Amino acid sequence: MASEMKYFLDQTTSLWLNGALHGKPACVFTSSGSMHGGQESTLLTMLPPLFHHGMMILGLNNAIPALSHTKTGGTPYGASHVSGPRHDQSLSQDEKVLCEAQGKRLGEVVKKLQA
């Protein structure tokens, strides 16, 4: 995980002590310069702090066709993007579909929890 994200999460101790995020839904996403650039391990290292907060972790559903046939980013742990070695690649269509699906799922869960 990026040091900036780690620093941000390290600042949430007061939220943890108060249980402020317990039961709240969360998801993670990332990007890397290459297809084997550590996307899955990055997503997985972002999850433990969320578990410690008692958050509900949401991933991507394997029934989403784009997850099965993407040639760029995307894992069951969360949406991802392969930016290329020069970090100049735009999101692929599959990546866009997966990002939208993840955001939609997060929104749907939030609505159900608020009902």
PLM features: residue spans?
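Glycine-rich phosphate/pyrophosphate-binding loop and the adjoining helix
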Residues: 59-115
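Helix-loop-strand module that forms the ligand-binding subsite of alpha/beta enzymes
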Residues: 1-68
